[in-house]
Every structure is written in C-alpha cells, then in structure tokens.
A protein has these predicted regions:
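Extended, highly charged segments
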Residues: 1-204
C-alpha cells in the first residue's frame, strides 16, 4: 500500500476509530491481527496484515477464523489494551503507521503499523505524525534525477514518482496541480492524479 493511499485511508478510519472501544484482539495467522471494536453502535473488525509485501488495513464485518488457543501476542494486546477506548489518532503516513491514545492514566498508545503490526507503547518518538517538508514543486523534475530523492523526501514514493512521470507526458497541467494539493489536501489530490493516469490506477 502506497503511503499516500495510507494517508487517505487513515483519515477515513479516524472517523470510525475515534471514541470506539476495544472488545478483543485475535491473531488468526502470523502477521495478522484482528481488533474487535464497538463503534457507532456496532461491532466491527479492524484487520491488519503487516509485512513488506501486500500489507492490509481495513474494517470488515467478517472475522477471520481463529486458532483454538490465542497467540501470545494477542494475549499481550488484550492485557494492555483490552476494554480501552481510542482517542483521535496521530498519523505518520509517510511510514504507514498511526497511533491512537488509549483511555486511562497514564496515556498509552495503540500503534498500527503496516510493516511491524500492532503494538502498545508508553511513548512515541519525537515528531511522530509531523508532516514532511515539501520542496519547491517547481524543482520536481530535477529532484527526480537525484539518486537520493527517496532518502531526502520519502513522501515522493516510487508510485507517486511513476504516476507524475506518466502525467508529465500525458497531462502536464494536472501534474502541476497534483503536487501542491498533495502537500495540503490528499483526499482531493489522489482521485485527481489517479483518474488521469489510467494505467497507474490499478496500483493505487
């Protein structure tokens, strides 16, 4: 999942997760965590599959089948976060993770990470959830030529670079609009970018 897609997904999930109560944790398979939530008068299942290839994060009415004996990590999560309510999340979208404060004192955080999975922590590192620095968008062409573009500006994900390169050939006007809007309003920019780069659409 591209970081910009995660950014938009996290904004939508925040509306459901904020104020919800954690009912239960399950681990139906390695690297997969199911969080049963009570939100908006309904029980819902938040499913996270962590890993480098094909990570997932979604709400679903269906709950995957679970092993007869709960996994150790699921039991640990139940101990430290079961029964707690979730506050408004901080989103580190560049690294595809979000942290939700748990009710109780002192405040602890439930962290959902597409690479590492689900955990609970007492503190977050400084700058968690801070927006990345965007360079002058007029310099985009020269930035793409640099070998260290990923290290300097991780928000220029491979898929975003490929999409903008495609737009440079097919729709330069839209490409010029995408970058400024992406840095401010992802929900507006993403549909605009992907709808005009047809062959890139399935990968978004």
């Amino acid at each position: 999942m591209d970081a910009h897609v995660f950014r938009r997904l996290a904004a939508e999930l925040a509306q459901v997760l904020t104020g919800s109560r954690i009912e239960r944790f399950y681990a139906p398979a390695p690297d997969i965590t199911t969080i049963v939530l009570y939100a908006a008068g309904l029980k819902q299942n938040l499913l996270l599959r962590a890993g480098r290839r094909f990570p997932l994060l979604l709400l679903t009415p269906e709950r995957p089948e679970n092993p007869a004996s709960p996994a150790a990590h699921a039991m640990w999560l139940r101990k430290h976060a079961g029964g707690r309510r979730l506050g408004a999340p901080l989103v580190d979208w560049v690294n595809r993770r979000m942290a939700l404060p748990l009710s109780g004192s002192p405040v602890r955080w439930l962290v959902l990470c597409l690479r590492e999975g689900v955990t609970v922590t007492d503190t977050l590192e400084d700058g968690f959830g801070s927006e990345p620095t965007w360079p002058d968008h007029a310099r985009f062409a020269s930035i793409l030529e640099g070998r260290e573009v990923w290290a300097a500006y991780p928000q220029y994900t491979p898929l975003l670079r490929e999409t903008l390169a495609e737009l440079a050939e097919t729709d330069p006007w839209t490409r010029r609009r995408c970058l400024p809007i992406l840095s401010m309003a992802p929900a507006t920019a993403l549909p605009m970018c992907i709808s005009t780069a047809g062959k890139m659409f399935p990968r978004w």
